[in-house]
């Protein structure tokens, strides 16, 4: 059962001291501020992150023009259960039933010569992008964005601090060469009329575009438009989260809950139905295939520890639930 979060408060934290600063005092202060929301709503906004948000939004908006159902741009790379790509690719909408469409891509370091690729290890794939001549720089910018977020401490700073607070050593850091991290570009379209069959209904009667779920990740770094549609489940019921067009929304994934017996739980969240054109760009931070997830005893009380597993095993199991 998901853990009900104590609040829906989402503070904004300046993470520039952790990224660019050398003075240890503001760096410690910034890290400490990111710990509190992990025990509150499970979310916080990261400001002063150094990413060119306008360029990112322009890149994201380009995908909207390419997802027109009359275009074959994405269709040639679409995901289906019969091909070898089980993560990367275009997930098509289903007219009249499913309106949301998305594009997922993985670590650009996964080339044909990568050891995991040669071994045929699941969840390791070479990215397939739309035609570069028709869409110049689209694939290159996407892979640049993946590298910037995963290789820097933009997202790792929060995860590392949360792990240390709960008692874990810092031996399982994310490496650019092996991370299983993924980016999803999710389009919620405006439609007139909007098909009723595509709208879900929550137990409380709220109309939804995406039902409640936990993120199977270390943490999730989200860039989204300022359309208010995200909610978190709290002890006081479902509460709406604030929006920001400039800052990244960061939340705990199930990884931290697994290691800490939910001392740092993954927040249960959902997307309300809003008939408005919008894009959501979550970056799911993952460790490498062979990183060992060893739960630790601090802050677990008398609860039984979860078994130690490799991150690859944990992630693959999470995808099959």
From Swiss-Prot:
Gene Ontology MF terms in the entry: iron ion binding; isopenicillin-N synthase activity; L-ascorbic acid binding
Residues holding isopenicillin N: 87, 91, 188, 280
Cofactor(s) required, per the database record: Fe cation; L-ascorbate
Protein's job: Removes, in the presence of oxygen, 4 hydrogen atoms from delta-L-(alpha-aminoadipyl)-L-cysteinyl-D-valine (ACV) to form the azetidinone and thiazolidine rings of isopenicillin.
GO BP of this protein: antibiotic biosynthetic process
Native species: Streptantibioticus cattleyicolor (Streptomyces cattleya)
Superkingdom of origin organism: Bacteria
Metal-binding recorded as keyword: yes
List of residues binding 2-oxoglutarate: 278
Similarity field: Belongs to the iron/ascorbate-dependent oxidoreductase family.
Sites where the protein binds Fe(2+): 213, 215, 269
Segments for region (Disordered): 1-42
Catalytic activity: N-[(5S)-5-amino-5-carboxypentanoyl]-L-cysteinyl-D-valine + O2 = isopenicillin N + 2 H2O
Protein name as annotated: Isopenicillin N synthase
Alphabetic keyword roster: Antibiotic biosynthesis, Iron, Metal-binding, Oxidoreductase, Vitamin C
Keyword Iron listed: yes
Residues that hold N-[(5S)-5-amino-5-carboxypentanoyl]-L-cysteinyl-D-valine according to the record: 87, 91, 188, 213, 215, 280
UniProt pathway annotation: Antibiotic biosynthesis; penicillin G biosynthesis; penicillin G from L-alpha-aminoadipate and L-cysteine and L-valine: step 2/3
């Amino acid at each position: 059962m998901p853990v009900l979060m104590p609040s829906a408060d989402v503070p904004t934290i300046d993470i520039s001291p952790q990224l660019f600063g050398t003075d240890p005092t503001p760096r410690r202060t910034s890290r400490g501020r990111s710990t509190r929301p992990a025990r509150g709503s499970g979310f916080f906004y990261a400001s002063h992150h150094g990413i060119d948000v306008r360029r990112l939004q322009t890149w994201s908006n380009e995908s909207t023009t390419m997802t027109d159902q009359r275009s074959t741009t994405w269709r040639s790379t679409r995901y289906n259960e019969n091909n070898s790509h089980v993560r990367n690719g275009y997930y098509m909408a289903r007219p009249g039933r499913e309106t949301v469409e998305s594009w997922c891509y993985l670590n650009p370091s996964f080339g044909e010569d990568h050891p995991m690729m040669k071994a045929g290890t699941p969840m390791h794939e070479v990215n397939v992008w739309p035609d570069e001549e028709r869409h110049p720089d689209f694939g290159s910018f996407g892979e640049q964005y993946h590298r910037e977020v995963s290789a820097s401490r933009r997202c790792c700073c929060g995860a590392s601090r949360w792990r240390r607070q709960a008692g874990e050593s810092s031996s399982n850091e994310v490496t650019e060469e092996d991370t299983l991290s993924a980016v999803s570009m999710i389009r919620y379209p405006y439609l007139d009329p909007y098909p009723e069959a595509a709208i879900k209904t929550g137990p409380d009667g709220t109309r939804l575009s995406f039902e409640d779920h936990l993120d199977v990740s270390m943490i999730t770094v989200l860039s989204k438009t300022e359309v208010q549609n995200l909610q978190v489940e709290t002890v006081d019921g479902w509460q709406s989260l604030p929006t920001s067009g400039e800052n990244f929304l960061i939340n705990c994934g199930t990884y931290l809950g697994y290691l800490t017996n939910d001392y740092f739980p993954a927040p249960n969240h959902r997307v309300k139905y809003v008939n408005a054109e919008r894009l959501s760009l979550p970056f799911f931070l993952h460790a490498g295939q062979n990183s060992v997830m060893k739960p630790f005893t601090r802050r677990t009380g008398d609860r039984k520890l979860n078994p130690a597993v490799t991150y690859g095993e944990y992630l693959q199991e999470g995808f099959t639930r």
